[in-house]
């Protein structure tokens, strides 16, 4: 998993404050905007936070990408397994961590699998992934279209997403997906997004008590 910044609105916090003062044009160029942004967050005037945007590159797996793509307030561009050879991203499929299913909460897992069992099962997974990747490559060599060959690949296959959204969307996504109830691997992505967000939007992050 890796998350990196691609682009962000120039002077984003200043720009949002400028737009927030649309009804007070004589004060729009006021450089003191921290208090205004804090006020807007405190009183949930969220529309102003739709005026600035950020795009991140997220390198993850197909399984996690399916969860991320459900956040429809964002716009996405994803690596196409139909157009491109998946080996362009990585020739190996990463072995996932293994956790026990929580029988009381089906959306939760518990990290208490014995090490010996974990190693045994991860080796089985490694063999399975290698066989799947070998078959995928064989299909390509035989002239089978990528759009057909991709169906033998597991959900752990690497993918790349460009995720673009407003500050408001990022606040909602990070708040939701960095909290309990989110799959650990997705939580790690959300926290990586949060780290970049706090660097790019320090005033907003402080008002949200993220720093």
Language model features with spans:
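Family-specific signature for flavin-dependent thymidylate synthase
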Residues: 1-211
